[in-house]
A protein has these predicted regions:
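Charged, terminal alpha-helix-loop-beta segments
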Residues: 1-212
Length: 212
């Protein structure tokens, strides 16, 4: 569905563009902007690391690692491409690799991230507890699940088929489309969660709760 500009005398469709054409790079632009505005693709999420890669025998890095209000870890992978590449496969690996993270490890990772972005005196542990609404750490409740958010300009049929298959098997994974438009000298981005559709996600939650 196109996006339109309502002008004084007419309604004009905006011109679709690509992140490449408007010279927005994946890491230095898209990732940097979303890191400080993470609610655009992952509401109620606290970013605790960027380019996270604290594991042995692997040079892989998670674009953005966060935590949600339910103390679930959130792996966020970004692509500016028109098909999403193989980002779902990368994200599954990352989710498995961080699934054993403890609260203390997360607090340490968060502290290093805060120092890197110019907030070395912020108490990472206290801020993490405050975000979760906890008085003290609860390791039994921490990181009981890992959610995956894939954000890309577009997604291939292969990728969306894989994501739907994973959802059917209980994996919390979603696709958020970032479609850029050009308007004069500005770049506008239409952000839409396309899988699962928000209405379907709410329905699935209700069905799951009913089964319990």
């Amino acid at each position: 569905m196109p996006i339109y500009e309502f002008a004084s005398e007419e309604i004009r469709p905006l011109n679709k563009t690509t992140f490449g054409l408007v010279q927005l790079k994946e890491r230095t632009d898209l990732q940097r902007l979303l890191r400080v505005n993470i609610s655009v693709v992952a509401p109620d999420t606290l970013v605790i690391a960027e380019e996270f890669g604290d594991w042995d025998e692997s040079r892989r890095r998670i674009d953005i690692l966060g935590i949600d209000r339910d103390a679930n870890l959130v792996v966020i992978e970004l692509k500016r491409t028109e098909d999403g590449g193989h980002m779902e496969l990368q994200a599954i690996r990352y989710a498995a690799m961080v699934s054993t993270m403890t609260f203390d490890q997360a607090a340490d990772v968060f502290a290093r991230f805060l120092a890197r972005i110019g907030k070395p005196h912020t108490d990472a542990r206290a801020e993490l507890l405050d975000f979760l609404g906890w008085d003290e750490p609860d390791e039994d409740a921490f990181a009981q699940d890992v959610r995956i958010v894939l954000a890309s300009a577009e997604f291939s049929r292969e990728l969306t088929t894989s994501v739907l298959w994973l959802i059917e098997r209980g994996i919390d994974i979603r696709c958020v489309r970032l479609q850029p438009y050009s308007l004069d000298s500005r770049v506008l981005v239409d952000v839409q969660q396309i899988i699962p559709l928000p209405e379907m996600a709410e329905y699935q939650i209700r069905v799951t709760e009913k089964k319990r």
